C-alpha cells in the first residue's frame, strides 16, 4: 500500500511540474547541484597541520588517479569497472572541481575517455545496482564540462535501470540490501543533476522510501538485509551517504522529502551514541568488541558534515562529532594516500563472526572514496 501511495504521489508531483508548480522541469541544476545553503561552521574552519581537507583530499585523489583501473589490478582481473572505483572517481571529480584543480580534473577525464573508445568493453552493463552506479562518473563529468558524449552514456545507463520496472514501480534491480541505497541513488540523482528531469529524483526517492520501510530499525540503524540482523558499518554508511546525496537535490516540496529527512535524522542521532572516542565507528556499529572501520567512518563523516552545513542537523550537537570523525579518519591515511582498516568487500550473511572477522584492508578504494566525499563536503 505504501508503494502504491508513493506512486500516486510521484504522479501528482510530475503533474505539478508539468504545469509549472514546484520547479521548472528539464532545467539542469548548477554545477554545485544542491539547494542547501552553505553555512559557516567554526569547527570546520581550522585544522591541525597535515589534516586539512585540501591536503588529505589531494593526497588521496593523486593516489587514485596514478593507479590503473581497479578491476585490472585484481587477480584474476574482472572484466569491467567496479563500483569502488566509480565511487572514488566521483569523489575525486567533485574534489577537483571544488578546489579549482583543473589539472586534476583533466587527468580524471582523460582516465575516462578510453572507455568511450578502444576500452569501451570495460564499461559495465547496467543489469545490477553495482554496475549501474557507473553512470555517476560520466554524468559528473558532464555536469562539470557539458560535453554531450558523457551525458548520453550516463543517461542511457540510468534509463536502463528503469527499463522494465516491477509492478510497484521499483527498479527490477531492487534486492533490499542496504548497499543499494547508495548505488541506485547515485545513478539516478546524478542523472537529475545533469538533465534537470525530475523523473530521476522520483525514481531515487521512491526506491529510498521502500528501503527505509523495509530495513530501518527502531533505533535508527539499518540491517544489512531483512534476514541479516546486524548493523554492519559500511552498509549503514552506504545508507547515510545515499540519503545525503538525495537530500542535497530533493526539493523542499517533494512529497517524499519529509520521510527521508526524518529517517536521516533518526539514523544520525543513533550514530552519535556509538561514535568512538577517536571519532571512528566500528565494523559492527553496536559491538564495542569490533574494530574501528574507516570506510563507514568516512561515509558517516560525509553525511554529518553535509547535514551540519545544510542546516538539517543541530550545529551545536553534530559539528563537534563531525570534526572528530574527520580527524579520526585522517589518522588512517598514510603518506602515500592509502587508507587502512578498510573492511573488505562483504556480502550479506546471518553470522556474527563473519562480520567481526572480515579482513582489514589497506589501499582499498572502499575507504578512499568516502574520504574524497567528506573532503568535498567540507569544501562546499
Pin down the residues of each PLM region.
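Bacterial N-terminal signal peptides
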Residues: 10-22
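Bacterial Sec-dependent signal peptides at the C-terminal "C-region" and cleavage site
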Residues: 21-37
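Helix-capping and short linker residues that terminate individual alpha-solenoid repeat units
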Residues: 69, 100, 116-121, 146, ...
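Aromatic-lined, polymer-binding surfaces characteristic
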Residues: 81-85, 89-92, 124-142, 176-188, ...
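N-terminal secretory signal peptides that target proteins for export/translocation
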Residues: 1-7
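Extended ligand-binding clefts on enzyme/binding-domain cores
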Residues: 178-179, 189-284, 290-301, 313-347, ...
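CBM-like carbohydrate-recognition segments
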Residues: 33-86, 98-114, 118-135, 141-144, ...
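Asp-box/WD-like beta-propeller blade repeats and closely related beta-sheet repeat scaffolds
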Residues: 150-186
Amino acid at each position: 500500500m505504501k508503494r502504491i501511495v508513493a506512486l500516486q504521489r510521484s504522479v501528482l508531483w510530475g503533474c505539478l511540474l508539468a504545469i509549472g508548480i514546484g520547479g521548472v522541469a528539464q532545467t539542469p541544476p548548477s554545477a554545485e547541484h544542491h539547494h542547501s545553503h552553505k553555512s559557516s561552521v567554526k569547527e570546520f574552519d581550522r585544522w591541525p597541520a597535515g589534516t586539512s581537507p585540501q591536503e588529505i583530499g589531494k593526497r588521496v585523489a593523486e593516489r587514485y588517479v596514478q593507479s590503473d583501473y581497479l578491476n585490472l589490478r585484481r587477480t584474476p582481473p574482472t572484466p569491467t569497472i567496479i563500483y569502488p572505483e566509480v565511487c572514488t572517481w566521483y569523489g575525486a571529480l567533485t574534489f577537483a572541481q571544488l578546489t579549482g584543480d583543473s589539472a586534476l580534473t583533466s587527468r580524471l577525464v582523460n582516465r575516462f575517455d578510453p572507455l568511450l573508445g578502444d576500452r569501451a568493453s570495460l564499461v559495465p552493463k547496467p543489469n545490477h545496482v553495482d554496475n549501474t552506479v557507473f553512470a555517476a562518473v560520466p554524468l559528473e563529468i558532464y555536469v562539470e564540462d557539458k560535453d554531450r558524449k558523457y551525458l548520453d552514456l550516463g543517461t542511457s545507463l540510468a534509463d536502463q535501470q528503469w527499463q522494465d520496472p516491477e509492478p510497484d514501480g521499483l527498479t527490477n534491480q531492487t534486492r533490499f540490501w542496504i548497499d543499494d541505497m547508495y548505488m541506485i541513488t547515485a545513478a539516478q540523482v546524478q542523472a537529475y543533476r545533469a538533465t534537470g528531469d525530475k523523473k530521476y529524483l522520483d525514481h531515487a526517492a521512491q526506491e529510498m522510501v521502500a528501503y527505509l520501510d523495509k530495513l530501518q530499525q527502531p533505533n535508527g540503524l539499518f540491517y544489512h538485509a531483512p534476514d541479516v540482523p546486524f548493523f554492519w558499518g559500511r552498509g549503514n554508511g552506504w545508507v547515510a551517504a545515499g540519503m545525503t546525496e538525495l537530500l542535497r537535490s530533493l526539493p523542499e516540496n517533494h512529497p517524499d522529502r519529509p520521510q527521508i529527512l526524518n529517517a536521516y535524522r533518526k539514523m544520525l542521532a543513533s550514530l552519535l551514541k556509538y561514535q568512538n572516542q577517536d571519532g571512528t565507528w566500528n565494523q559492527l556499529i553496536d559491538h564495542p568488541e569490533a574494530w574501528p572501520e574507516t570506510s563507514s567512518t568516512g561515509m558517516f563523516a560525509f553525511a554529518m558534515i553535509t547535514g551540519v552545513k545544510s542546516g538539517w542537523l543541530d550545529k551545536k550537537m553534530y559539528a563537534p562529532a563531525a570534526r572528530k570523525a574527520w580527524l579520526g579518519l585522517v589518522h588512517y591515511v598514510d603518506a602515500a594516500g592509502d587508507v587502512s582498516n578498510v573492511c573488505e568487500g562483504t556480502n550479506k550473511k546471518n553470522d556474527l563472526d563473519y562480520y567481526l572477522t572480515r579482513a582489514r584492508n589497506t589501499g582499498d578504494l572502499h575507504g578512499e572514496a568516502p574520504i574524497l566525499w567528506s573532503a568535498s563536503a567540507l569544501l562546499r
